[in-house]
Amino acid sequence: MLNETLHVPVGIIVSCWGGSSIESWMSPEALQSVDGWDRKQAEARKKIQQRPSLLYNGMITPINKFSAKGFLWSQGEGNIQNYKLYAQLKTAMVKQWRTEWKNPNMPFYFAMSAPGKGHKGKPFLVEQQIKCLDMIPNSGIVLTTDLGKEFEYHYPQANIVGERFAILALSEAYQMKGFPAHGPLLEGVVIENGRAIVTYKDTPLGLCPTSYNITGFEMAGADRKFHPAKARIVDKEAKLVVECEEVPEPIAVRYAFHSWYETNLTNTFGLPAQPFRTDNWDNVE
């Protein structure tokens, strides 16, 4: 897609190893800069691709003299059990990589882990991934809310992920206009009068679907028990009203905050919305 659109050759240098941890792609110095990171615990992992700095030494250092436009990153499952430091680790890694490529603002685009059963920590990992958008300047995300498969760890439609990476790069790195870089990102949630108003950003033409039910929303009251909620678009804006008959006095709203879910909220270009929650509770099924 980049070749066809830009009319110039575009190459990709691939450094990858399935099931790797983010720590393996980082230098010892970058790892030590992350407060709370436990080296002994990381070194105890049995899988070679999860050992600290191993893939950094073998697959990043040998290529850091090549010039490049930016980075594409698709990883996360290898850190699903220690997700709490993921955003900090990724921020430190990107800072280090940009230093080595001598470009402090080098674009860094990453894919969200897709839905799929297997580990209850996945929604928390995804939350950390989305948090990186605010922590890493000039970063972007490929949302994969619609690409999962119930009993698979990874998205089976890898070609669609690649196309969305291309769309993101064309919009952000190459400044092309006329299409959004990604799906709807959460701007804010206001809960009042028994309902929630959910507002999205970077969605100038509004949300979809407009003609049938929007799925994936849940609400909870003081008992912290979540129930499916109904959502409707407000006047063709990037705004939703979310309500739930079973929860007359809601205090929390979630969207797609499970390991496995099926949702249908997108922008008018068909790019899916991000998962989110307004609470900080640990109850996830």
Give residue ranges: language-model regions.
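Cell-envelope and extracellular/periplasmic
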Residues: 1-285
